[in-house]
Amino acid sequence: MTRGICILGATGSIGKSTLDVVSRHPDQFRIVALTGNHRVAEMQLLCQQHHPELVVMAAPEAAQQLRVGLGDAGLKKIQVESGPEALAEAARMSGVDEVMAAIVGAAGLLPTLAAVEAGKKVYLANKECLVMAGNLFMERVRQHQVTLLPIDSEHNAVFQCFADGKGVRRILLTASGGPFRTWPAEHLAVVTPDQACAHPNWVMGRKISVDSATMMNKGLEVIEAHWLFDLPASRIDVMIHPQSIIHSMVEYVDGSVLAQLGNPDMRTPIAHALAFPERMESGVSSLDLAHGPDLQFEAPDLQRFPCLALAFDALQAGGAAATVLNAANEIAVQAFLEGHLPFLRIAAVVEDTLGELQPAAPDHLDDVLAIDQLAREVALRHLARHGSGMQ
């Protein structure tokens, strides 16, 4: 029997990789629902390839444009909707068994929660769910007895090495260091968005590419790991590994260190999660250690990467600091991508917003959303002070 799958964020890099893996196993999966932001032409192509029952676009204009395109292509039977409620409905559709949660940013929280509350199996690629609302999110996962499998390559690697979690001393999340790891510090002042998005190893969207360049992405992953594996910040370390071959490690109290290795291709963790506890073909080429690059490791430079330090600070501060961190970072990164904020001022906007707001831990989802909105407003105010355009 095939398993019905909904892909939240189908036109993004994780969504496309998921569809690539799923298409290799048509006897196991059927595409029930796809969601996207604004890439109408790409979504129409996906519809022609996979014939979902439902498609949801972020905006009504994009949805209408897609309806016209699908009609012209003879695919009028595909239902097209738009907006946040339609996103949630896609995640909880009766024909959906499993949900790939791959919407980037805070926008992914509500539809992913809808999937959890509907009892779907959830593949979590949206780290903001745990960064913004970790306690509430995991509480819902336990309440609804949902199977939650991590998709981020680092957390998937830890999951594969973690076993039952007994005897774990610490986990080590690896990081490539991004495109600017070896750049002279004075050159960072004139970094452009295109340079920041040119990741040396991974193919990713623009927002997550900038987060990788600042190492905020690794900071968010530290917070995510805290909730996924129930470990304090003191037992989560970050190691720079420029080759992105070792995806993370788990150290045990007896001195053993288990590592998960593989070529840097998101189809590997996706296939692992989709097949768990079995294995399936992913299309990823075999790792050739004999002819590959030498493996290097170094500690992260927190002076060069202040966003990583800010994320650790937010996790240790508790309360809603991580929610504030995430909201301020989204505002700052978007401003950088639009040319309104220099690269080196991203961390300053986040730090100033964290310094101004110290809200208590949220008791309800509405509290999370209110804190997120307030943090965005405060970040915009600080952006006006720091944002002098590209230097």
Curated annotation (Swiss-Prot):
GO molecular function, one term: 1-deoxy-D-xylulose-5-phosphate reductoisomerase activity
The enzyme's E.C. designation: 1.1.1.267
InterPro entries in UniProt: DXP_reductoisomerase, DXP_reductoisomerase_C, DXP_reductoisomerase_N, DXPR_C, DXPR_C_sf, NAD(P)-bd_dom_sf
Entry keyword DNA damage: no
Name of one Pfam family that matches: DXP_reductoisom
Catalyzed chemical reaction(s): 2-C-methyl-D-erythritol 4-phosphate + NADP(+) = 1-deoxy-D-xylulose 5-phosphate + NADPH + H(+)
GO biological process, one term: isopentenyl diphosphate biosynthetic process, methylerythritol 4-phosphate pathway involved in terpenoid biosynthetic process
Binding-site positions, 1-deoxy-D-xylulose 5-phosphate: K127, S153, E154, S176, H199, S212, N217, K218, E221
Pathway participation: Isoprenoid biosynthesis; isopentenyl diphosphate biosynthesis via DXP pathway; isopentenyl diphosphate from 1-deoxy-D-xylulose 5-phosphate: step 1/6
PANTHER family reported in the protein's UniProt record: 1-DEOXY-D-XYLULOSE 5-PHOSPHATE REDUCTOISOMERASE (PTHR30525), 1-DEOXY-D-XYLULOSE 5-PHOSPHATE REDUCTOISOMERASE, CHLOROPLASTIC (PTHR30525:SF0)
Family: Belongs to the DXR family.
Protein name as catalogued: 1-deoxy-D-xylulose 5-phosphate reductoisomerase
Source organism of the structure: Acidithiobacillus ferrooxidans (strain ATCC 53993 / BNL-5-31) (Leptospirillum ferrooxidans (ATCC 53993))
